[in-house]
C-alpha cells in the first residue's frame, strides 16, 4: 500500500477516518521522537532505575530475571530489536548489545549474532515502559484506552508511572470497541 511500516499504514487509516468526520488530530511518531532525542531523558531514567523497573515489571510479566534491561537496541547489522543489552553507559547515553534473538508469541526470532553499541536514539523502551514514558514526554493528562487494556496494560502503566517515573498517571477513560 506504499507505506514504510505497519505503524505508518494504520496511522494513515486513522488520519483518513478522522478527516472524514471532521476531527482535527495531530499525529506524532514515536520513531521520530526517539530519533530527535525526546525520549533520551526517560530512557536514562528507566535504565538508571533498572532494578526498580525489573521489580515492577515482574509483578505483571513472567521471566523477568536479574539480567533483564528494559531497553531494546536496534541491531546495526540486521535492524531487528532482537538484542540483549550487555552494559549501559548513562553518561554517553549508550548501550552495548548482542543480537541474540528473542521469543515472541511462542516463536523464536533469530538474532544475527552482531555485537555493537547503540545510542538511546537507536532503540526503544519495551511497550510497558514506553506507554508511561509517553505520558511524561508528551505531558499527557487524559488517556482513553480500550477495555482490553483495563486489567493488564493500564495497571502496569500506573505502577510504572508512580514507582519508576515518580509521576501521577493521566486520568483514564475506558471505552468499548469501536470501528472506523
Question: Locations of the language-model features?
Answer:
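N-terminal Rossmann-like or analogous alpha/beta NTP/dinucleotide-binding catalytic cores
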Residues: 1-54, 64, 156-159
Amino acid at each position: 500500500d506504499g507505506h514504510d511500516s505497519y505503524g505508518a499504514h494504520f496511522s494513515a487509516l486513522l488520519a483518513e477516518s478522522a478527516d472524514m468526520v471532521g476531527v482535527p488530530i495531530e499525529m506524532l511518531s514515536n520513531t521520530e521522537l526517539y530519533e530527535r532525542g525526546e525520549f533520551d531523558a526517560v530512557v536514562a531514567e528507566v535504565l538508571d532505575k533498572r532494578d526498580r523497573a525489573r521489580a515492577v515489571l515482574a509483578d505483571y510479566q513472567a521471566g523477568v530475571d536479574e539480567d533483564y534491561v528494559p531497553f531494546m537496541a536496534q541491531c546495526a547489522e540486521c535492524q531487528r530489536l532482537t538484542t540483549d543489552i550487555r552494559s549501559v553507559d548513562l553518561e554517553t547515553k549508550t548501550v552495548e548489545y548482542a543480537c541474540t534473538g528473542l521469543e515472541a508469541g511462542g516463536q523464536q526470532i533469530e538474532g544475527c549474532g552482531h555485537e555493537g553499541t547503540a545510542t538511546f536514539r537507536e532503540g526503544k523502551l519495551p511497550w510497558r515502559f514506553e506507554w508511561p514514558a509517553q505520558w511524561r514526554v508528551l505531558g499527557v493528562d487524559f488517556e482513553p484506552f480500550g477495555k482490553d487494556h483495563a486489567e493488564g496494560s493500564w495497571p502496569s502503566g500506573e505502577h510504572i508511572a508512580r514507582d519508576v517515573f515518580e509521576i501521577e498517571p493521566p486520568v483514564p477513560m475506558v471505552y468499548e470497541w469501536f470501528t472506523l
